[in-house]
């Protein structure tokens, strides 16, 4: 099921939110999202369960929690406005739902960038079957 996330990124194209999130991640980490974050640990990618495996995976856990607070739009498909200004990601929507989605993505991209030096290749393509410990609450 988590591999569906890769397909979703490819199918959504330039208008979809997952593409926008991927651009933010690339800007902050220098890593392509499909190869580095689409299936990483227990939370990066589609769905999530168990305990986050490291700081990178925790960024994805917090991002999932943030998406859980979004009402009135689908955070995985909502298209918002944002820009890169002097290395910062700036969300520009007045619509509360779209702005919230953008801020969730912005915070996660910044978190991933702050933890890029501890990125562990052992968690790339990590099997969800290893994610059996009880999850913390959002």
Swiss-Prot record:
It catalyses: a 1,2-diacyl-sn-glycero-3-phosphocholine + H2O = a 1-acyl-sn-glycero-3-phosphocholine + a fatty acid + H(+). InterPro entries: PLipase_A2 (IPR001211), PLipase_A2_Asp_AS (IPR033112), PLipase_A2_dom (IPR016090), PLipase_A2_dom_sf (IPR036444), PLipase_A2_His_AS (IPR033113). CDD domains: PLA2c. Pfam families: Phospholip_A2_1. Its EC number is 3.1.1.4. One of its GO terms (biological process) is phospholipid metabolic process. The active site is at 63, 105. Ca(2+) binds at residues 43, 45, 47, 64. GO terms for molecular function: calcium ion binding; calcium-dependent phospholipase A2 activity; phospholipase A2 inhibitor activity; phospholipid binding; toxin activity. Binds 1 Ca(2+) ion. Coiled coil: none annotated. It is found in: Secreted. It comes from the Eukaryota. Its main location: secreted. GO terms for cellular component: extracellular region. Residues 1-16 form the signal peptide. Disulfide bonds join 42-131, 44-60, 59-111, 65-138, 66-104, 73-97, 91-102. Keywords: Calcium, Disulfide bond, Hydrolase, Lipid degradation, Lipid metabolism, Metal-binding, Neurotoxin, Phospholipase A2 inhibitor, Presynaptic neurotoxin, Secreted, Signal, Toxin. Expressed by the venom gland. Heterodimer: RV-4/RV-7 targets the presynaptic sites of the neuromuscular junction. Monomer: snake venom phospholipase A2 (PLA2) RV-7 that has low enzymatic activity and is not toxic. It inhibits the enzymatic activity of RV-4 in vitro but potentiates its lethal potency and neurotoxicity. It may facilitate the specific binding of RV-4 to its presynaptic binding sites, probably by acting as a chaperone, minimizing distraction and destruction of RV-4 en route to the site of action by reducing non-specific binding to muscle and other organs. PLA2 catalyzes the calcium-dependent hydrolysis of the 2-acyl groups in 3-sn-phosphoglycerides. Belongs to the phospholipase A2 family. Group II subfamily. D49 sub-subfamily. Heterodimer of a weakly toxic basic protein having phospholipase A2 activity (RV-4) and a non-toxic acidic protein which inhibits its enzymatic activity but potentiates its lethal potency and neurotoxicity (RV-7). This is Acidic phospholipase A2 RV-7. It comes from Daboia siamensis. The lineage of its organism: Eukaryota, Metazoa, Chordata, Craniata, Vertebrata.
